Amino acid sequence: MRSDKIKKGVEQAPARSLLHATGQIKSPGDMDKPFIAICNSYIDIVPGHVHLRELADVAKEAIREAGGIPFEFNTIGVDDGIAMGHIGMRYSLPSREVIADAAETVINAHWFDGVFYIPNCDKITPGMLLASVRTNVPAIFCSGGPMKAGLSAHGKALTLSSVFEAVGAFKDGSMSQEDFLDMEANACPTCGSCAGMFTANSMNCLMEILGMAVPGNGTTLAVSDARRDLIRESAFHLMDLVKKDIRPRDIITKDAIDDAFALDMAMGGSTNTVLHTLALANEAGIEDYDLERINDIAKRVPYLSKIAPSSSYSMHDVHEAGGVSAIVKELVDLGGAIHPDRITVTGKTIRENVADAKINNTDVIHPKENPYSPVGGLSMLFGNIAPKGAAIKVGGVDPSVQVFKGEAICFSSHDEAVEAIDNHTVREGHVVVIRYEGPKGGPGMPEMLAPTSSIVGRGLGKDVALITDGRFSGATRGIAVGHISPEAAAGGPIALVHDGDIITIDLPNRTLNVDVPDEVLEERRKELPKFKAKVKTGYLARYTALVTSAHTGGILQIPEDLID
């Protein structure tokens, strides 16, 4: 066993003495059992994580029952909704790397035989995923689950995105204070990840098709007894994985990454999944995985399930309609869309996991014969503004908008743009350009949910576009193009766009261009000032020095002269 490194032999007597002091070694025979880490992410200020201490206790009990010795530790967590619109958002994406590094540190320092990961919200799941392939110790994931959708006084289904959009409507005078406060009070009625197909739930759904979580992981409610049952089931599967020495890199292959994007396309997931899954591919040592490959997948996978913010349906509606398994079953039956014979943490293949799945509500999950669209809900755009690519959630764009051509109005920060939208400087026909908000420029690639929500809340969702080298919340909808690469801080051409330039967003042709000759752009480049880091000390300064643009997944890259 891997853990023999810290518990076997005369030399490890001091380590054994310390292990006895933990209270987890309850009998002499426990030293002969697998040591299992429970990588939890309990934190009081994140509603998706407030119940995870209880879930960890369920996992501990089941691990002991299955023959292992559990040891729990916690990572950090950032709530993107609470951190939105201020300096806190600059820490959100960077927290992914902190989580991965922290988990790697504890797992490798203590030589665990297996790891039970309990994530839930936006950066916690991908951070733990990066750690799982980096340490490559037998592992399983079981998230905390989504919250219930809220209900307004008027009987309207609510999610957190409803509140963000209400801010714009209230400021504009089109919503009463009574309705505004009602939304605020009722949109988030329980613990769990936010109720729509936002980043957290998108990632937790992808865990099922990646093969790292059991069916039901992405949609089973946080407050349900079934969520506790999933934790128990996962603990027993983990002990089998340890026994058989099946590791994350045996499961997370190039085919698995392809299939994750296929499901993403079918369910119209958050654009953040692109960032995190690209980072996962890099961490797993999968070479030559780029945005063009994602577009190829989008062209062959239909869009089957439109969930909030793209509709009024919540994650619980998806669960009742058959869950992720029902969507995956459609992709299996489609033929050629995914690789269904890959192994998963259940010991079965994807095909076997979903064999009995069926659609219970064809309004929530469309059958493959009647998709929302014959192509996927996400699209990668390329052009002279984004030579390395950009991402848009086409499932969140009004279907009547196929090509948008408008006049650029440029801002060098999120806050400047929000102010301009609020004071009506931004008008119908504008393309709002927000740059220097990428991974390096932000720093931290903050989400642009406030400006997009304000645009939609004012009724301009079809009439104003927004493009940025920053990113978007999974709650974003409208004509919102993010992840533009290279970013402005890295010299990307988004920095060369001027007010009044005509920008064309062509969704069918997957292009993003500014109508300015190349030679003019090159002249503008000569006048471009050198980027200087906005943060000079602390973690964000170190992050700025190492982070790369979004087309890589926003990974940290060690200077080549240090590793060659």
Curated annotation (Swiss-Prot):
Alphabetical GO biological process terms:
isoleucine biosynthetic process; L-valine biosynthetic process
Keywords recorded for this protein, A-Z: 2Fe-2S, Amino-acid biosynthesis, Branched-chain amino acid biosynthesis, Iron, Iron-sulfur, Lyase, Magnesium, Metal-binding
Residues where [2Fe-2S] cluster binds: C121, C194
- Pfam families the UniProt entry points to: ILV_EDD_C (PF24877), ILVD_EDD_N (PF00920)
Q: Which free-text remark accompanies the cofactor?
A: Binds 1 [2Fe-2S] cluster per subunit. This cluster acts as a Lewis acid cofactor.
Look up the EC number in the record and give it. Answer: 4.2.1.9
Q: What class of enzyme is it?
A: lyase
From the UniProt record, give the pathway where this protein acts: Amino-acid biosynthesis; L-isoleucine biosynthesis; L-isoleucine from 2-oxobutanoate: step 3/4; Amino-acid biosynthesis; L-valine biosynthesis; L-valine from pyruvate: step 3/4
Annotated active site residues, numbered on this chain, are: S473
Q: Which cofactor does it need?
A: [2Fe-2S] cluster; Mg(2+)
Its function, per the record, reads: Functions in the biosynthesis of branched-chain amino acids. Catalyzes the dehydration of (2R,3R)-2,3-dihydroxy-3-methylpentanoate (2,3-dihydroxy-3-methylvalerate) into 2-oxo-3-methylpentanoate (2-oxo-3-methylvalerate) and of (2R)-2,3-dihydroxy-3-methylbutanoate (2,3-dihydroxyisovalerate) into 2-oxo-3-methylbutanoate (2-oxoisovalerate), the penultimate precursor to L-isoleucine and L-valine, respectively.
Its quaternary organisation is: Homodimer.
| Protein name per UniProt | Dihydroxy-acid dehydratase
- Which species is this UniProt entry from? Listeria monocytogenes serovar 1/2a (strain ATCC BAA-679 / EGD-e)
Which gene is transcribed and translated to give this protein? ilvD
